[in-house]
């Protein structure tokens, strides 16, 4: 019986009356899903700008940015307003210097700075040409309970462009200082930090205020390769929209002795910045 293949149209000798294809290859091709043909004239074009404005009207604010004062750092990322940013790194890497450069970039805007480490140098502020009228400093207490109230009041006031908490690892709780050295107060700082974030998160959003939390990197004891962790629990990593890790890559020194200077005098160091979490741009970039 001669029949025509339903796939290729070739005439073939059918052994059965129900045969439709001339070969197994034609049967497989005919059973494969066919691509959907889209009419270019009828295809709907996604209007990005129009839909963006609709989402903003729903109550989702567009991200506004604050410069870090360092062009190379701004090319990686800036600091988002109305959100929480954590800057972490080892000692001496330049976390505080980065925060002070952010303040210098704001110029006439007000900043609330919490110096829980009590290590801020006024000469450095003058070198960066910061205005005392716009720089509100809090270093009256290192207790987390007092610092939390100060952050809460600053966030609710809405008069600050940025609140800088330098640093979370350096603050303590009253239970830690009033007890004995051998007392173990586990999880108190993490509990207070979790509660603080819940209290200020919506105020930061509504007032478009950036909260920058500086944190230290520490190592766990034990094992061949110690794990890196940041004090204060997991509340900040979960709530932060941006997390930046700073790492020293190379120290820069004078190659030769200058007139009246010591040989190989320290000049600075190279810092590598890495985005380890981001809800506002692409993460895991350096």
Q: What are these language model-derived features?
A:
Residues 1-35:
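BZIP DNA-binding basic region
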Residues 186-286:
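Phosphate-binding/switch region of NTP-binding enzymes
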Residues 120, 171-172, 220:
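Catalytic P-loop NTPase motifs of RecA-like helicase/translocase cores
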